[in-house]
């Protein structure tokens, strides 16, 4: 169901409802941006929030929100009525409301009646059913932007407050995974001891929930493409030059006319709050120290407003654009990003439907097992669990109807008309023919990408596509800016791509893992690691500037040994 239909239906329900008695003003859920703090000073403060969310809430790769799948707030805040003295609710009473007929959830210390919202929920009814009568604070905050409650619910849905000591009786306390993560965070070594991006992933495996690791790490189906992307970098070898004056190294360049001190950018990657309470804001703060370009994900767990509000005045952020099937909504989102100051628009074109991400799906299937506590509750209540699962499907891949599956090359003109003077980049290109079409239809750049190997399993690694462009139409590399991502982890990976003609290389998962473990300090450290590796490798390769990186400096051993001309 589209957000427009959700809003219309909710407003109709509210119009038909009888006036509610005056109540005190609702408490806001939006917190002001927390000041930057190092991992060592933050300790375990609030780090457990959002880390041990129930596996039933991680599906596909879009992140299944309890209330809203879109972090972009398109509407003005819905009016909140005055509330009187809040009614005290016991855990036992909350737990009773766990069916379609009466469904309550607890967020922080507040109890909400979401019965009339179940069928309207953009993420589907099942995820609400699985968490009915429970405390959902951790999972809610880990994947939802602030003000989500205020956007979709009114004071009529407010039931009362639950005593803090009662919350643990409905799942609000620390479970075994919470305690494991809390202890692992206490044992984190100093961020300055990390020497490469791979270490951030190794460290994150200890401090992330099973759900977060599945979401961040999964590829599509057999994960052939996920494996192949790492191997692709190893199939390109250097042909270094020696006896050159290598004391001074210059790594400055421009992306889409935007100056950058390094030929790297932060690729869009969603749900950073699964790893850290500050989520995408950590990445913005860490990147600000280095002035490299960050492409803000449309699937972020912070709202677009939250993300842009913590950037430095001169910091450059671009925005990832999933074109909504409702062009009016698509235009509203685009206008909002531009109004906030997005310097470029990265149009994602490789998601006409969501890929089959089996690590996510297997984890969710386990949570839907008949013996799962929620299923046991259904059974006790007389629900037909097997019939429900059979009808809706265990995988329950999130509905992607809001993404325009009919998006085509003619739509590029529509986007350019609504973003005059702003660079447009096509993200998700997988062959030389589509690079040619991108140039033909007026795009300023392309990102050779497989969506993190999360879409079409068996698709070629982006680096192999870059080699194809170099072989079949090398002139394109001077006519349109070509970027590449796909499991790059090293400064040497960046140089290999630049030797083959890429303008720059995007890093996604590496920054997710870095911020998960160490917040903004982790992002800062990751960039410093890459900077050092790039400069060191340039000296060893014999290149003083990025312009000195030439095709003849590499040898490609797949699909055949070949030295580019």
From Swiss-Prot:
Homotetramer. In the N-terminal section; belongs to the cytochrome b5 family. Keywords: Aromatic hydrocarbons catabolism, Electron transport, Flavoprotein, FMN, Heme, Iron, Mandelate pathway, Metal-binding, Mitochondrion, Oxidoreductase, Respiratory chain, Transit peptide, Transport. Pathway: Aromatic compound metabolism; (R)-mandelate degradation; benzoate from (R)-mandelate: step 2/4. Its cofactor is FMN; heme b. Residues 1-54 form a transit peptide. Phenylglyoxylate binds at residues 215, 322, 451, 454. It catalyses: (S)-mandelate + A = phenylglyoxylate + AH2. InterPro entries: Aldolase_TIM, Cyt_B5-like_heme/steroid-bd, Cyt_B5-like_heme/steroid_sf, Cyt_B5_heme-BS, FMN-dep_DH, FMN_HAD, L-MDH/L-LDH_FMN-bd. It comes from the Eukaryota. Heme b binds at residues 121, 144, 215, 364. This is (S)-mandelate dehydrogenase, mitochondrial. It holds the Pfam family FMN_dh.
């Amino acid at each position: 169901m589209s957000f427009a239909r959700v809003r219309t239906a909710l407003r109709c329900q509210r119009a038909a409802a009888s006036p509610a008695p005056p109540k005190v003003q609702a408490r806001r859920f939006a917190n002001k941006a927390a000041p930057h703090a190092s991992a060592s000073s933050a300790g375990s403060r609030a780090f457990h929030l959002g880390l041990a969310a129930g596996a039933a809430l991680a599906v596909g790769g879009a992140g299944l929100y309890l209330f809203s799948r879109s972090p972009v707030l398109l509407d003005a805040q819905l009016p909140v009525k005055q509330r009187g003295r809040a009614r005290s609710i016991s855990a036992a009473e909350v737990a009773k409301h766990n069916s379609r007929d009466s469904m309550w959830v607890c967020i922080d210390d507040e109890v909400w009646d979401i019965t009339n919202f179940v069928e309207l929920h953009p993420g589907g009814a099942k995820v609400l059913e699985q968490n009915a009568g429970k405390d959902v604070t951790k999972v809610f905050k880990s994947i939802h932007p602030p003000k989500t409650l205020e956007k979709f619910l009114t004071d009529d849905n407010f039931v009362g407050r639950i005593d803090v000591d009662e919350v643990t009786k409905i799942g609000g306390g620390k479970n075994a995974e919470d305690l494991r993560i809390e202890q692992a965070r206490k044992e984190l070594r100093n961020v300055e001891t990390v020497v490469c991006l791979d270490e951030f992933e190794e460290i994150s495996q200890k401090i992330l929930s099973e759900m977060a690791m599945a979401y961040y790490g999964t590829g599509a189906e057999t994960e052939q493409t996920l494996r192949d992307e790492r191997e692709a970098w190893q199939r390109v070898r250097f042909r270094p030059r020696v006896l050159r004056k290598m004391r001074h190294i210059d790594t400055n360049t421009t992306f889409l006319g935007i100056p950058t001190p390094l030929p790297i950018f932060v690729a869009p990657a969603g749900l950073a709050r699964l790893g850290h309470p500050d989520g995408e804001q950590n990445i913005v703060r860490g990147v600000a120290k280095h002035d490299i370009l960050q492409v803000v994900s449309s699937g972020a767990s912070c709202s677009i407003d939250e993300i842009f509000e913590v950037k430095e005045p001169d910091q450059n952020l671009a925005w990832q654009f999933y074109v909504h099937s409702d062009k009016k909504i698509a235009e509203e989102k685009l206008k909002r990003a531009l109004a906030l100051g997005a310097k470029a628009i990265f149009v994602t074109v490789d998601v006409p439907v969501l890929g089959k991400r089996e690590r996510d799906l297997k984890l969710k299937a386990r949570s839907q097992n008949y013996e799962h506590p929620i299923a046991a509750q259904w059974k006790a209540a007389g629900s037909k669990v097997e019939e429900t699962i059979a009808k809706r499907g265990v995988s329950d891949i999130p509905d992607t109807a809001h993404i325009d599956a009919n998006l085509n090359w003619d739509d590029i003109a529509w986007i350019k008309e609504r973003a005059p003077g702003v660079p447009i980049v096509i993200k998700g290109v997988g062959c030389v023919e589509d690079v040619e079409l991108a140039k033909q239809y007026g795009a300023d750049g392309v990102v050779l990408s497989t969506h993190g190997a999360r879409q079409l399993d068996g698709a070629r690694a982006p680096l192999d596509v870059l080699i194809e462009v170099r072989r079949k139409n090398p002139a394109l590399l001077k006519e349109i800016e070509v970027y590449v991502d796909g499991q790059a982890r090293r400064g040497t990976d960046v140089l290999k791509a630049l030797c083959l003609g890429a303008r720059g290389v995007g890093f996604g998962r590496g920054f997710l893992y870095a911020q998960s473990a160490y917040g903004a300090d982790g992002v800062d450290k990751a960039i410093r690691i890459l900077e050092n590796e790039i400069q060191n490798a340039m000296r060893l390769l014999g290149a003083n500037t990025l312009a000195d990186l030439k095709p003849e400096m590499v040898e490609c051993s797949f699909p055949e040994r070949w030295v580019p001309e």
